[in-house]
A protein has these predicted regions:
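N-terminal amphipathic alpha-helix/helix-capping segment at the start of soluble metabolic enzymes
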Residues: 1-19, 268-277
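N-terminal small/glycine-rich loop or linker at the start of catalytic domains
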Residues: 7-26, 55-65, 191-206
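Structural preference for beta-strand elements that scaffold enzyme active sites
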Residues: 16-20, 47-53, 89-91, 109, ...
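Alpha-helix-loop-beta-strand connector modules within alpha/beta enzyme cores
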Residues: 38-46, 65-91, 126-132, 182-194, ...
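Active-site-adjacent loop and "lid" segments of alpha/beta metabolic enzymes
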Residues: 65-73, 111-116, 172-176, 199-225, ...
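Catalytic alpha/beta core domains of metabolic enzymes, predominantly
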Residues: 129-130, 134-236
Length: 277
């Protein structure tokens, strides 16, 4: 299996469980820096490698009137502060091919949103930056179908690819996670990350915005780690009820440390007693 490194944080192989985490969207400069610092403090105590993630533009919000973020220029400036002042690797998403090059100047890895996981020009542009690419699996795709998206990246000479499971559409306004997806994705030869919080969205289920079921974060995250994923993706907020995006499915900051304590123990058992599936 290919091992992927994002700013010194390793995914796959014999690396310990890694975490990609942050707020869904950059809400303000002060909030982003404060939250990043507090997340780093917690992950450092638990010895969990951290990649910080926040979006500068949520281009696929349900409603035209929903908060999208500060935009690319201001967003990248804020992420650059997080990177250099806190020493954290940065991952953020792009929605257009023209965003790839400027984002790659700041971010240590580029993310392809699940809704855009088949957009060839976007994937090729991300690959050509030479940065690691985190491919979110579309909510409409079978695990094995991600081999075609992976091939679009590797065909450009970039072997640094991660695939992230974020649930599959299950009727209207609902998602589910099929645990069989994790071993199937690992057979594609790339590290696998589990996006727990997005998997708990109820898309469009709250009158123009997505609802969510954050109460299931602990069991889903535990199951994913037990299934042998290489990393977890968590949206984290210090006050989810006031979050400007994805609050209903976000992990409350004050619940992060006990969650990581549990997950680290599970990961240690998986890594020391069995080969990852």
């Amino acid at each position: 299996m290919e091992t992927v490194t994002i700013g010194g944080v390793g995914f796959g192989g014999n690396h310990r469980l890694a975490l990609i985490a942050g707020p869904c969207v950059i809400e303000s400069e002060a909030h982003t820096l404060s939250l990043a610092k507090r997340i780093k403090t917690i992950t450092s105590r638990q010895n969990v490698p951290l990649v910080f993630k926040a979006s500068f533009d949520k281009a696929n919000r349900t409603s035209l009137h929903s908060f999208r973020g500060p935009g690319i220029d201001e967003g990248l400036r804020i992420l650059d502060r997080v990177k250099h002042e806190l020493g954290l690797p940065i991952l953020t998403d792009i929605h257009e091919a023209t965003q790839a090059a400027p984002v790659a100047e700041i971010a240590d890895a580029l993310q392809i949103p699940a809704f855009l996981s088949r957009q060839t020009d976007l994937l090729l542009a991300a690959a050509r930056t030479g940065r690691p690419v985190n491919l979110k699996k579309g909510q409409f795709l079978a695990p094995q179908d991600m081999r075609y998206a992976i091939a679009k990246i590797t065909a450009s000479g970039n072997s640094q690819v991660i695939v992230t499971e974020r649930g599959v559409t299950f009727g209207y306004n609902n998602l589910m996670v099929d645990m069989r997806a994790f071993p199937q994705l690992r057979k594609l030869g790339v590290p696998v990350v589990f996006d727990v919080t997005h998997s708990l969205q109820l898309p469009g289920g709250a009158d123009g915005v997505s609802n969510g079921q954050a109460e299931f974060i602990v069991p889903l995250a535990s199951a994913g780690v037990a299934a042998g994923v290489d990393g977890l993706f968590l949206e984290i907020h210090d006050s989810p009820s006031k979050a400007k995006s994805d609050g209903p499915n976000a992990c409350p900051l004050d619940e992060l440390e006990p969650l990581l304590q549990r997950l680290v123990r599970i990961d240690e058992v998986v890594r020391t007693t069995t080969a990852r599936v």
